Each structure stands twice: as structure tokens, then as C-alpha cells.
From Swiss-Prot:
This is 2,3,4,5-tetrahydropyridine-2,6-dicarboxylate N-succinyltransferase. GO terms for biological process: diaminopimelate biosynthetic process; lysine biosynthetic process via diaminopimelate. It is found in: Cytoplasm. Its main location: cytoplasm. CDD domains: LbH_THP_succinylT. It comes from Yersinia pseudotuberculosis serotype I (strain IP32953).
């Protein structure tokens, strides 16, 4: 694996000079191999090690390099044709392979090669970009987007129109992460490497980036870039120091544990915020 990483790191330093016409065989094979490993879930761009999320930057570099080594090509879809550098994940799947891997894909859901989809996942008409990791039992609902290299945990529900930010455009240091057992409400956006920790509930229409203030109304604490585990979050505003205006924030209205979540529905958690 170290040899593979060395090839990627070296190639990335000269990425501006690499084209589909001049890329050498060793570099092409290394990049292609990494994309295959990401595609099967054998590798992932970020993983939790000793309780902390660690980003493997060299894998992200391999994803970026993959755009340098391929020309656009025509790809066939059920109702249309595509023209892009990155092939579709399911292009070579037959019924036996879909059954073996154990997830559902509802047309016209689109997944790029290099994204991993785990068992018991349901993809409604949605989009999952290269390098993403979607773990077991997750629902990616209609028109939701899982950005490049984003990490989605087990038993997550990404509601209709949710946007989970990627790392490629604009270039971000770390992927956006939604941990296990989280719910993200319709049309919400979580971007710029924000981490939503386990068991959190994000209401409809909440927008969280690295500069978004995440205000805990019980403690008065303000978080940036991280939603603490078990938080129930709605959109809100905080006043300026002189009271002349207010600016958008996300508000943690309560904390819940796994026991409470198992007994109380998502809608009830969001409706009883007083």
C-alpha cells in the first residue's frame, strides 16, 4: 500500500502536466487501482481511528488525479446518454451482482465509479459522487446529493433535496461526515467538512458550513464545524452585539440519547422543541 501511495503522491506533484495522452502506465494503473478500492469500500477517504476522524489525503489526491487521466466518453443510461470522464458505478452490473451487493437503486439515481454503497442501502433518484462512502441501512432520498468523498454512516436518512458537500470543487481539506443514526431533514445542506456526530437530528432547511455558528441554547456554547452527538438542530438567528441586526445560525434545541430516539419518532423530536 505504501508503494501505491508513493506513486499517487509523486504524480500529484506534477498533476498539471498529466493528460490522458501522456500519463504513464504505472501512474494510470495506480490511480485506477485506488478508484477500484474506493468503489468496493476496501479503502475510504476518511475513517474513525481511536475515536477521531482521520482523512487520508493521498486517497483524495488519487480521486483528483482520476480526472486527469481519462477523456470524456459516451455513457448509456436508461432514458438518456451521458458524456463524462468518470464512468458510472453500475455500468457493468447485472441482476446477480445487484442481488449479491444487496442495495436498491431507483431510477434515475446516479452513482459514479469510486463511490461505495453498502448493503441494505436505498438510493432514491439521487446522486452519489466519486470517493463517497455510504454505509449500511442508509436511505438517500429523492434529489439528495452525496458529494465527492463524503462519508455517510450506518442507518442515516438523507431526506429529499439534502446536499452533503464534497471536497473537489471547491477544493476542501476534509470531507463532510454524517455519522451513524443521523437524520438530515429535507433541503438541508451540510458542507465544508462539517461533522454531524452520531444520533443527531437536523431539521428541514438547516444550512451548516465551517463558518456557521451552531448555538446550544441550553449551555450558551457556540460550536463551529461540528454538531455534537445527539443534537436536535433547527435553523435560527443570533443578534449582533448592539442588537441592530441578526445573522443566521443553527440552534441546538435539545440533546437526545439512543434510548429516547428509539422511543420517540423524528417528527416528535422536532415538534417539541420548547
Amino acid at each position: 500500500m505504501q508503494q501505491l501511495q508513493n506513486v499517487i503522491e509523486t504524480a500529484f506533484e506534477r498533476r498539471a502536466d498529466i493528460t490522458p495522452a501522456n500519463v504513464d502506465t504505472v501512474t494510470r494503473e495506480a490511480i485506477t487501482h485506488v478508484i477500484d478500492l474506493l468503489d468496493t469500500g476496501a479503502l475510504r477517504v476518511a475513517e474513525k481511528i481511536d475515536g477521531q476522524w482521520v482523512t487520508h489525503q493521498w486517497l483524495k489526491k488519487a480521486v483528483l488525479l482520476s480526472f486527469r487521466i481519462n477523456d470524456n466518453q459516451v455513457m448509456e443510461g436508461a432514458e438518456t446518454r451521458y458524456y463524462d470522464k468518470v464512468p458510472m458505478k453500475f455500468a457493468g452490473y447485472d441482476e446477480a451482482r445487484f442481488q449479491h451487493e444487496g442495495f436498491r437503486v431507483v431510477p434515475p439515481a446516479t452513482v459514479r465509479k469510486g463511490a461505495f454503497i453498502a448493503r441494505n442501502t436505498v438510493l432514491m433518484p439521487s446522486y452519489v459522487n466519486i470517493g463517497a462512502f455510504v454505509d449500511e441501512g442508509t436511505m438517500v432520498d429523492t434529489w439528495a446529493t452525496v458529494g465527492s468523498c463524503a462519508q455517510i454512516g450506518k442507518n442515516v436518512h438523507l431526506s429529499g433535496g439534502v446536499g452533503i458537500g464534497g471536497v473537489l470543487e471547491p477544493l476542501q481539506a476534509n470531507p463532510t461526515i454524517i455519522e451513524d443514526n443521523c437524520f438530515v431533514g429535507a433541503r438541508s445542506e451540510v458542507v465544508e467538512g462539517v461533522i454531524v456526530e452520531e444520533g443527531s437530528v437536523i431539521s428541514m432547511g438547516v444550512f451548516i458550513g465551517q463558518s456557521t455558528r451552531i448555538y446550544d441554547r441550553e449551555t450558551g456554547e457556540v460550536h463551529y464545524g461540528r454538531v455534537p452527538a445527539g443534537s436536535v438542530v433547527v435553523s435560527g438567528n443570533l443578534p449582533s452585539k448592539d442588537g441592530s441586526y441578526s445573522l443566521y445560525c443553527a440552534v441546538i434545541v435539545k440533546k437526545v440519547d439512543a434510548k429516547t430516539r428509539s422511543k420517540v419518532g423524528i417528527n416528535e423530536l422536532l415538534r417539541t422543541i420548547d
